[in-house]
């Protein structure tokens, strides 16, 4: 809570156990299809990065290349985190196409579950792309918005996430431009 108050980050109403809330509600792309995905119950995940994005957003199209590079490199050094895609697309078809076309290496919340997970909506922002970094109990540690309305972009919360998972990352590792909220 101190991190939330200090940085004017949105707060969730109560603590949630993220892995439990996501059980049975995730999918992942496998080349040309979408399949159910299960978090490994034997492996505790300390940090989650929820990536709110949409196929129709040019800002998301710019940022996803950087996020994929980050994910692949970070997974070679740290296994104790997960990125979860939260679609802001208008249909399940658009979400699936986006996941497959971009070859997203991380899981996503099933389209039919997006409105059923209150903490996911509470942790989001008004526009995309948006990053919300949570610990395993639902404390928001970094966010693309300050005070729920001031968009700061994706760079700062991604850098904070890298520190939390003890991964040395610099946006100079990639030539992608900072995403602009849409």
Where are these regions (language model features)?
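Hydrophobic beta-strand anchors of alpha/beta hydrolase catalytic cores
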Residues: 49-50, 131
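Solvent-exposed loop/turn segments at secondary-structure junctions
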Residues: 54-58, 88-93, 113-115, 138-140, ...
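Thioredoxin-like thiol-disulfide oxidoreductase module
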Residues: 88-127, 132-133
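Conserved redox-active cysteine motifs that mediate thiol-disulfide chemistry
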Residues: 52-69
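Thiol-/selenol-based redox modules, centered on thioredoxin-like
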Residues: 134-182
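A short beta-strand-turn-helix
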Residues: 21-48
């Amino acid at each position: 809570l101190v991190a939330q108050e200090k940085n004017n980050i949105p707060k969730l109403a109560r603590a949630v156990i993220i892995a439990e809330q996501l059980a049975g509600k995730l999918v992942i792309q496998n080349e040309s299809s979408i399949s159910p995905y299960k978090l490994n119950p034997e492996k505790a995940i300390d940090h989650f990065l929820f990536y709110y994005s949409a196929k129709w957003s040019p800002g998301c199209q710019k940022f996803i290349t950087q996020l994929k590079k980050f994910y692949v490199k970070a997974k070679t050094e740290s296994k104790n985190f997960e990125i979860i895609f939260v679609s802001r697309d208008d249909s399940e078809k658009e979400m699936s196409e986006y996941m497959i076309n971009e070859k997203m290496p991380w899981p996503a919340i099933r389209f039919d579950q997006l409105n059923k997970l209150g903490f996911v909506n509470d942790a989001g922002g008004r526009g995309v792309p948006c990053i919300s970094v949570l610990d395993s109990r639902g404390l928001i540690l970094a966010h693309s918005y300050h005070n729920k309305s001031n968009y700061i972009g994706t760079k700062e919360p991604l850098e904070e996430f890298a520190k939390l998972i003890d991964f040395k990352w610099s946006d100079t590792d990639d030539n992608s431009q900072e995403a602009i909220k849409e």
